[in-house]
From Swiss-Prot:
One of its GO terms (molecular function) is large ribosomal subunit rRNA binding. The keyword Repeat does not apply. SMART domains: Ribosomal_L14 (SM01374). One of its GO terms (biological process) is translation. Coiled coil: none annotated. Binds to 23S rRNA. Forms part of two intersubunit bridges in the 70S ribosome. Belongs to the universal ribosomal protein uL14 family. This is Large ribosomal subunit protein uL14. The lineage of its organism: Bacteria, Pseudomonadati, Aquificota, Aquificia, Aquificales. GO terms for cellular component: cytosolic large ribosomal subunit. InterPro entries: Ribosomal_uL14 (IPR000218), Ribosomal_uL14_bac-type (IPR005745), Ribosomal_uL14_sf (IPR036853). Part of the 50S ribosomal subunit. Forms a cluster with proteins L3 and L19. In the 70S ribosome, L14 and L19 interact and together make contacts with the 16S rRNA in bridges B5 and B8.
Length: 122
């Protein structure tokens, strides 16, 4: 469960290390984002040689959350951290690698490229 102001790790090799959520599209009633939601983030810390630069604003998709995600079969899945993958304007990943596991819900939301690059899908 991600809200405005939440700090998140990046799960790709775009160069950003830490980002902050600054917007959740969906109107005034959309207060929280969960796995598979696209949010607006700003880069808070980045490596100097990376594509993503500190202070820039990007779209990102949430791939892991500490808050558990309910599955239709009654099971729950949660991760150790909150993580996102940075996206370009066409909603494609900026990085070429995905680090760590991603949730299976991304496949049903249409992020096939992220699921195929991920080392593990939970």
């Amino acid at each position: 469960m991600i809200q405005r102001g939440t700090y998140l790790n990046t799960a790709d090799n775009s160069g950003a290390k830490l980002v902050q959520c600054i917007g959740i599209p969906g109107g005034a009633k959309k207060m929280h984002a969960t796995v598979g939601d696209v949010i607006t983030v700003t880069v808070k810390s980045a490596i100097p040689s990376g594509t993503a630069k500190k202070g820039k604003v990007y779209k990102a998709v949430v791939v892991r959350t500490k808050k558990e995600v309910a599955r239709p079969d009654g099971s729950y899945v949660k991760a150790d951290d909150n993580a996102v993958v940075l996206l370009n304007n066409q909603l494609e990943p900026i990085g070429t690698r995905i680090l760590g596991p991603v949730c299976r819900e991304l496949r049903s939301k249409g992020f096939y490229r992220i699921v195929s690059l991920a080392p593990e899908v939970i």
